[in-house]
Amino acid sequence: MHSFSRRLTAGSIGTLFAVCALSPAWAQSSAPQTERLAYSMMIGGLHVGDAVVDLSQDEDDYQTGLKVSARGIAKALREFRADLSSQGGFTTDGAVPLPLPARFKRDWSGAEIEASMIMTYDPVTRVTTKQERYVSRETGEEMTRDELPWVKNDSKREREAEAKRQVPDDAKVGTLDPMAAFIAARHQVMAQGATQAPVKFRVPVYDGQRRYDIVGTTTAARSVTINDKTYNVITVNTTLVPVAGFSEKGEERMRQSRGKILFTADDRFIPVQVTIENEYMSGVMNLTADCKITPEACTPAQQQAAAN
């Protein structure tokens, strides 16, 4: 994969995981909640992607999905699409609902490769099992990981180093997939009353390749205007703390990344703006539509027309 696409994918999709999982509110943990929201992604003032988030949950179960497509210059340089989903149930940690993921799936495609990963969780031990598949878009044939362009270009030393960086099984136990992790983080924020006082949280994550923690803090509610619309928001500032599975450069890059998410300070608690900064980019993602109110805003054709 082209280096630009890999950087865009790492930064933008990582941020979108947060939006996908944090969208619904649980002011009342027993209240069923559904959301369908559309977002636009901007980097350097350029429109580079669109996303649609779906989530449905009640006191027993949750299902969440995310579809993202490259737009504008990003689409011209390297077409990219991703489709992610997570589902599971809930247990309780004190008075806070804690997600228990059952299945996490991540599909993506670029100009050369189509890839799919499915991660499942043992309901008793919570041990994860992962299956991955790569297909060449040119030939339609399945590829091994060693045949992937970005792996083939690595030196023997780099491949040996990657093999040693595999996350040990015991480090995966008790972790959440990225989408379930942000659901857990949002529950902690709401349970601790972020509208009244600052809240801190830390959630363990395994994404199928890397093990890290999401660490966040909130600030007091304030009024902001975004695209001529005024919101009363709570700010959640996040950092990612690497634990296992990283190269030296990858660990440094993750430590340097900073995220900020603005949530409406109401019962829905939905994100209206996300910003992310690292050594490669500074990007922003804005809420463009509530698809339950404006369904056409979330169709691929309408998003493509808006991008042109």
Positions of the model-derived regions?
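Small/flexible residues
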Residues: L8-T9, A38, K105, V135, ...
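Hydrophobic alpha-helical segments and helix pairs
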Residues: L100-R157
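Sec/Tat signal peptide C-region and signal peptidase I cleavage site
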Residues: L22-A27
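Bacterial N-terminal signal peptides that target proteins for export
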Residues: M1-T15
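Short, surface-exposed secondary-structure junctions/capping segments
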Residues: K130-S136, R165, P300-N308
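Acidic, serine/threonine-rich low-complexity disordered tracts
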Residues: Q28-T125, P178-N308
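Surface-exposed beta-loop interaction hotspot
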Residues: S155-T175
